[in-house]
UniProtKB/Swiss-Prot annotation:
Disulfide bonds: none annotated. GO terms for molecular function: ATP binding; sulfate adenylyltransferase (ATP) activity. The lineage of its organism: Bacteria, Pseudomonadati, Pseudomonadota, Gammaproteobacteria, Pseudomonadales. With CysN forms the ATP sulfurylase (ATPS) that catalyzes the adenylation of sulfate producing adenosine 5'-phosphosulfate (APS) and diphosphate, the first enzymatic step in sulfur assimilation pathway. APS synthesis involves the formation of a high-energy phosphoric-sulfuric acid anhydride bond driven by GTP hydrolysis by CysN coupled to ATP hydrolysis by CysD. It comes from the Bacteria. The gene is cysD. Keywords: ATP-binding, Nucleotide-binding, Nucleotidyltransferase, Transferase. Heterodimer composed of CysD, the smaller subunit, and CysN. The keyword Nucleotidyltransferase applies. This is Sulfate adenylyltransferase subunit 2. Pathway: Sulfur metabolism; hydrogen sulfide biosynthesis; sulfite from sulfate: step 1/3. It catalyses: sulfate + ATP + H(+) = adenosine 5'-phosphosulfate + diphosphate. SUPFAM superfamilies: Adenine nucleotide alpha hydrolases-like (SSF52402). Belongs to the PAPS reductase family. CysD subfamily.
Length: 305
């Protein structure tokens, strides 16, 4: 008698299969590591896929220099504990221009420090495949993206020119200069991610758990006061509105562009219970998703994750 796989075990098996396929098919793959919960699950699956050996590819963090301080600490801790080969890349042109989310806005900051930074890093190291932790339930443009997302020589995505994917058969053929972005977590939901983290004991950034934190409400979004730089861009009236609230983050990005949510969820079981009851998108707090200068699909067409 064959035991039936649970829902999460089926997702796990599918993701591990995808990761192994890419490692076998491509010459120089890399795993993008954004330090968030999805990256944590994807990294855990990759380590399972090749256990007891080490990962046959490096992990890479495209650093905007505006992540939460706890994210940087967590990244360095994981790299040391897991013995990972970490590549970090910061767009030197963006640094020279002093690009930041306050002065230049979310759209320009994201394009230069994230999109252009990623393209620079992929070109510099000659990677022909890059794993990402995006899921189809996150956002509508991601919902129609294939597991193997093909990019042209300029890293652009054409949603009208995607290859069919039948069952678990993936076509990895690319021409010179082309590459793919691979999304092993495509069929996972936010609830799946949290349940898997709970069952597997996967470490995550403490920012996901509710705690008293200093925040300021800007345009309906609770922005955390993570370091002194944000204070330079607040008026005296805004500084007077800084308060402490019990909040957590459902998604993590650049801290001035990532909103917190009020919550009492201090444990993984609390978070799972919250997920069962919530009716709002996890990306409601991501400022770039509401940027009038361009939709997520437009950003992906230009080479975004």
């Amino acid at each position: 008698m064959v035991d039936k796989l649970t829902h999460l075990k089926q997702l796990e098996a599918e993701s591990i299969h995808i990761i192994r396929e890419v490692a076998a098919e491509f010459d120089n793959p890399v795993m993008l590591y954004s330090i968030g919960k999805d990256s944590a699950v994807m990294l855990h699956l990759a380590r399972k896929a090749f256990f007891p050996g080490k990962l046959p590819f490096p992990v890479m963090h495209v650093d905007t220099q505006w992540k939460f301080q706890e994210m940087y600490s967590f990244r360095d801790k994981m790299v040391e504990e897991m013995g990972l080969e970490l590549i970090t890349h910061v767009n030197p042109e963006g640094v020279a221009q002093g690009i930041n989310p306050f002065t230049h806005g979310s759209s320009k900051h994201t394009d230069i420090m994230k999109t252009q930074g990623l393209k620079q890093a992929l070109d510099k190291h000659g990677f022909d495949a890059a794993f990402g932790g995006a899921r189809r339930d996150e956002e509508k443009s991601r919902a129609k993206e294939r597991v193997y997302s093909f990019r042209d020589s300029k890293h652009r995505w054409d949603p009208k020119n995607q290859r069919p994917e039948l069952w678990n058969v993936y076509n990895g053929k690319v021409n010179k200069g082309e590459s793919i972005r691979v999304f092993p977590l495509s069929n996972w939901t936010e609830l799946d991610i949290w349940q898997y983290i709970y069952l597997e004991g996967i470490p995550i950034v403490p920012l996901y758990f509710a705690a008293e934190r200093e925040v300021i409400e800007k345009n309906g979004t609770l922005i955390m006061i993570d370091d002194e730089r944000i204070l330079e861009h607040l008026s005296e009236e805004e500084k007077a509105r800084i308060v402490k609230k019990k909040v957590r983050f459902r998604t993590l990005g650049c801290y001035p562009l990532t909103g917190a949510v009020e919550s009492e969820a201090e444990t993984l079981t609390d978070i799972i219970q919250e997920m069962l009851l919530t009716r709002t998108s996890e990306r409601q707090g991501r400022v770039i998703d509401h940027d009038g200068a361009g939709s997520m699909e437009d950003k992906k067409r230009q080479g975004y994750f």
